């Protein structure tokens, strides 16, 4: 028994030894947890270090460097901060750098010190966008986080003085110069002003917010003019009656008022553009002619229509009516007036008459030398403008890029060649123009013009005539936006007459700029090209939503996935087509679908393709586009209630 017990004891001791070894080799749970915690703490410390790196504000020659990451944290507790937005490649920024460093050194000695910082606007795009930076360098002052524009010169003395002024504890922003108009004061202010610019805006409108600082800067500048030109604004959402009264349907809408009479504002929308435009608009719309010699020079050497009002004096009621009419057309034509009886005699008219005539180079035996209108006390300004517009074009005019909008009446017959009315080339120019006159006299319902081939090189290319090899080419532009090119051949009056006659009889095929027709067009969004616009968009049996886009347009790229989802959503509706067209590479063959920006979206309802509905909602998401379709669709297979 003893040997057996001894053997059992040995085995037991061996087992205990093995357990002890195993226990020593295995990791302790508490120990493992502690190690994991240490590792996590180290990682958190590393993250904190990274955050600290992001928030760290570096300094270069005394100027602090701010970026998208550290900006808000840095300015949060600062009373006043001077900022410069710059571009590394900007020459003006490089020239300004030493001056800015001197400014930083000076303001550092201020009590308390005022931080001076710079921001690379090309790399810190979020900040540049936030502060509407559009030029370099742009200087801003922050006062308790609020932006203060700096409009002075880029000198140490002027900038330091302005920053110190803003840093004073009792400094407050100056009141807005822009007047605020409501229904209570609108008529009083507007009726009393010789000229005033009024902006109708919506508080939520992005374009209005972008315009606001430029508008206020312009208001400040124009308030210093002599006499001052006031600028005002109307909240069109709160003042709905005023907005309706002046046909405000989009924002911002700007209108010029002269003693209460409204005129369209067609000028720029930035400070200097607004200032220059309003300064020009504040002058008289018509210039006085004192000497007969001036009229004679207009006739002999002029190259534009001559518009002259003949009146007794400035107190003549007809004169004021003429001024009102001239104001509405002052951007398109040059107006003149005279109180000279000698000039009236030369023009063969009595006082109170409006005379519209062409310089000698544009006169012909087929048309009157002048068109005269009698302006009475009962005459309306609209009748005067109608008379001017109706008679400003000669039988065959000179169409130029600068006045192309005068030639909006269609059909328009254009003859292209080297048009030059200078002394040396006038005879050659008139040689071809006279041939056009022979045809134009027989088609009074059409507008005829000659145009210089170099000025309209792009138009000739689109017509397929840029490489025709002919000295003279011709085309017809019709009211539907279509273009017809005359086959290149020897040009004469008979050839042009045959071309115009063929057009009148509907025997010509239009020239259409078009990408190739897609071979496979079965995707959720149909691709439309110039050659398929009529067959797809103008299909009378189908509702069509058409997007006009440009390949380079950022908004179009953002819209693309949403528009594709829209196509998928309605793919099962056979009588509804979701389509898109590159409007830069294809002709829109109907003038009812005007494309003035990208993207432009229209709904073309079945059976009424000449009245497309434009998508005006700023929210181009799936929900709003779907709602737009369902509001106007005539061919959805399900009812709107079900949708």
Swiss-Prot record:
Region (Disordered): 24-54
UniProt signal peptide: 1-20
Motif position, CXXC: 90-93, 553-556
Major localization listed first in the record, in broad terms: endoplasmic reticulum
InterPro entries noted in UniProt: PDI_thioredoxin-like_dom, PDIA4_PDI_b, Prot_disulphide_isomerase, Protein_diS-isomerase_A4, Thioredoxin-like_sf, Thioredoxin_CS, Thioredoxin_domain
Disulfide topology: 90-93, 205-208, 553-556
Transmembrane domains' residue ranges: none
Gene Ontology biological process terms from the UniProt entry: protein folding; response to endoplasmic reticulum stress
Modified residues (N6-acetyllysine): 365
Keywords, comma-separated and alphabetical: Acetylation, Disulfide bond, Endoplasmic reticulum, Isomerase, Redox-active center, Repeat, Signal
A cellular component term, taken from the record's GO annotations: cell surface
Entry's EC annotation: 5.3.4.1
Subcellular location: Endoplasmic reticulum lumen; Melanosome
Catalytic activity entry: Catalyzes the rearrangement of -S-S- bonds in proteins
Domain Thioredoxin, chain residue ranges per copy: 21-168, 170-300, 503-634
Composition bias, Acidic residues: 27-54
Motif annotated as Prevents secretion from ER, chain positions: 640-643
Subunit details: Part of a large chaperone multiprotein complex comprising DNAJB11, HSP90B1, HSPA5, HYOU, PDIA2, PDIA4, PDIA6, PPIB, SDF2L1, UGGT1 and very small amounts of ERP29, but not, or at very low levels, CALR nor CANX. Component of a complex containing at least CRELD2, MANF, MATN3 and PDIA4.
Homology family: Belongs to the protein disulfide isomerase family.
Official protein name in the record: Protein disulfide-isomerase A4
């Amino acid at each position: 028994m003893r040997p057996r017990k001894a053997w059992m004891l040995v085995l037991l001791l061996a087992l205990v030894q093995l357990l002890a070894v195993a226990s020593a080799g295995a990791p302790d749970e508490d120990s493992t947890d502690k190690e994991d915690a240490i590792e996590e703490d180290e990682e958190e410390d590393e993250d904190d270090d990274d955050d600290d790196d992001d928030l760290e504000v570096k300094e270069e020659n005394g100027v602090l460097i701010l970026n998208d990451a550290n900006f808000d944290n840095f300015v949060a507790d600062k009373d006043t901060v001077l900022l410069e937005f710059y571009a590394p490649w900007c020459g003006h920024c490089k020239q300004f750098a030493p001056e800015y460093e001197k400014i930083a050194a000076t303001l550092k000695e201020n009590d308390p010190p005022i931080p001076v910082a710079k921001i690379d606007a090309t790399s810190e795009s979020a900040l540049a966008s936030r502060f509407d930076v559009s030029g370099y360098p742009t200087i801003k002052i922050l006062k308790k986080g609020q932006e203060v524009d700096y409009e002075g010169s880029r000198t140490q003395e002027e900038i330091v003085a302005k920053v110190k002024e803003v840093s004073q504890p009792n400094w407050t922003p100056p009141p807005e110069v822009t007047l605020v108009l409501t229904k209570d004061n609108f008529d009083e202010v507007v009726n009393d002003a010789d000229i005033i610019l009024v902006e109708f805006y919506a508080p939520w409108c992005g374009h209005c917010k972008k315009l606001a600082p430029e508008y206020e800067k312009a208001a400040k500048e124009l308030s210093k003019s002599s006499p001052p030109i006031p600028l005002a604004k109307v909240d069109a959402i709160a003042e709905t009656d005023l907005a309706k009264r002046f046909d405000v349907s989009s924002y911002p809408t700007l209108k010029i008022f002269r003693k209460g009479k409204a005129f369209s504002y067609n000028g720029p929308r930035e400070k200097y553009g607004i200032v220059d435009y309003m300064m020009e608009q504040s002058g008289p719309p018509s210039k006085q002619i004192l000497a007969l010699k001036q009229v004679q020079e207009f006739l002999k050497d002029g190259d534009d229509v001559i518009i002259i009002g003949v009146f007794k004096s400035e107190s003549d009621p007809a004169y004021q009516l003429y001024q009102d009419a001239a104001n509405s057309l002052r951007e398109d034509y040059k107006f003149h007036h005279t109180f000279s009886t000698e000039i009236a005699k030369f023009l063969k008219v009595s006082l109170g008459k409006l005379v519209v005539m062409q310089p000698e180079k544009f006169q012909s035996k087929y048309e009157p030398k002048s068109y005269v209108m009698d302006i009475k006390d009962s005459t309306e300004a609209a009748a005067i403008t109608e008379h001017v517009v109706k008679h400003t074009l000669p039988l065959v005019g000179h169409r130029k890029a600068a006045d192309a909008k005068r030639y909006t009446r269609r059909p328009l017959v254009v003859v292209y060649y080297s048009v030059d009315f200078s002394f040396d080339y006038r005879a050659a120019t008139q040689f071809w123009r006279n041939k056009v006159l022979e045809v134009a006299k027989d088609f009074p319902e059409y507008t005829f013009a000659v145009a210089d081939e170099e000025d309209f090189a792009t138009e000739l290319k689109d017509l397929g005539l840029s490489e025709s090899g002919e000295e003279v080419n011709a085309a017809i532009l019709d009211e539907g936006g279509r273009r017809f090119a005359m086959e290149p051949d020897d040009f004469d009056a008979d050839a042009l007459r045959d071309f115009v006659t063929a057009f009148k009889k509907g025997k010509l095929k239009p020239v259409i700029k078009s990408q190739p027709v897609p071979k496979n067009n079965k995707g959720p969004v149909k691709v439309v090209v110039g050659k398929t616009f009529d067959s797809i968009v103008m299909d009378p049996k189908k509702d069509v939503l058409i997007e006009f886009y440009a390949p380079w347009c950022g908004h179009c790229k953002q819209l693309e996935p949403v528009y594709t989802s829209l196509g998928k959503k309605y793919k099962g509706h056979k009588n509804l087509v979701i389509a898109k067209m590159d409007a830069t590479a294809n002709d829109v063959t109907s003038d009812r679908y005007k494309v003035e920006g990208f993207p432009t979206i229209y709904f073309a309802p079945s059976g009424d393709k000449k009245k497309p509905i434009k998508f005006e909602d700023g929210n181009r998401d799936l929900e709003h586009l779907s709602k737009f379709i369902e509001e106007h669709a005539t061919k959805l297979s399900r009812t709107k209630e079900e949708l």
